């Protein structure tokens, strides 16, 4: 078994956080009761004993604001009726650019079956429409993300108060997740990275099983999930509480870029443009740190810039119901969007 997490688009549209939920929207249908229908899993005495009570139709309606609530086992009959009326059908799928799974997941299997059965219908992508909606956060969404960030900040403060040489990375992770649970977060928004010493050179190190040694740095990349909304924070601290002079130089170089970069995150700029500007800032700081010279930069291969050896990832990504939330790096930023700012060295 795996922990259940609601599909983000479905949660965004309905607020229903229960497995086997389906949402169908047919706003132009002549029958008003079919224009907006949510299907939820019908409970039983056995399910109630083993899994707990599921939502009633009334509860699902109160949560979602949808009047027409049906049991999931009614879906096929309703779908047949809707398909006899519809011409175009919009289907949902995971369109995250880095997503790859050789085995088709449930939504893709459903799409294939539907296309095979209704070959004369026109099928469209729902993702671009939902992306436009989810990119701009409402006041409520912004507050939930802010709360996730506050809980994450409390976890960071906890680590600052307990970290010492000899502590294990997994003990640090335990402190983080303890604070998450204490503040009613549903857990980490993603697998926490607790990387001491050379482990921090692996961008997505998640073993978290080494000892934090005296004189080393500890990189932590973690975030709480609260009400399905994510935080994402990366910080680096000295294990013994004091930076060496070189560690301080590197830390301050990244901090300067971080502070300047935040000022660039304004409506009108794209994430792609933003990342390029930050790359230039990081390049200048690396020259100042003596990692390479201006002359070497002038002679570098443009396709393999020298800064990539030390800074090989983007600085910002959208944040929301997903840690890497919906949005295109080529679209201009708008007021109401929420993004991370994570330069590193």
PLM features: what roles do these ranges have?
Residues 1-345:
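Active-site neighborhoods and metal-handling regions in enzymes and metal-associated proteins
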